[in-house]
Amino acid sequence: MKEPSSPTDGNPNEVVVVTENAQDEVEIDLARWGALAEDVLNAEGVTGELTLTFVGVADIRELKIEHFGDAGDYPTDVLSFPLDDGMPVADGIPRLLGDVVVCPAVAKEQAPSHAGSVDDEIALLVVHGILHILGFDHATAGEQTEMQARERKHLMNFFWHGEAPDGFSFDHRAEVGS
């Protein structure tokens, strides 16, 4: 089911997050994750439309191979597909930011050794994917430090509403895609 996280009147100066759950491996609260995505985009001062989709293991593996070639025969946790190339859009037309695709089953598998809980892991992946849409990366140590600081800030402000829980870690598996 696809649904915007909040009603829209087509105003290009607002944030619209369209959410979809295309998997049945892990229960997903679309409104919760759509609201987190909206909060992050608003905090980053970005307007436009973002799609946030939750898919199964087979689908994310297929997307990874299709878009990144033979990058290993394993699923990843999150993929980001930016659409906005920085070109101006016509008046009255919202900017299409891109698509963030999260695999809750992979999040569930890696959560105990990473973020701690499944919810913390999914929250981190949503924020991580959005930051990639906005042009942030973690290819160098400096980029990684900046990206993790932004992730922590957004999670503290909009998800935990305070400090990170015990057991939360930013250390990611080496094979996890962006």
Where are these regions (language model features)?
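An acidic/histidine-cluster motif and surrounding catalytic segment
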Residues: 1-121, 134-178
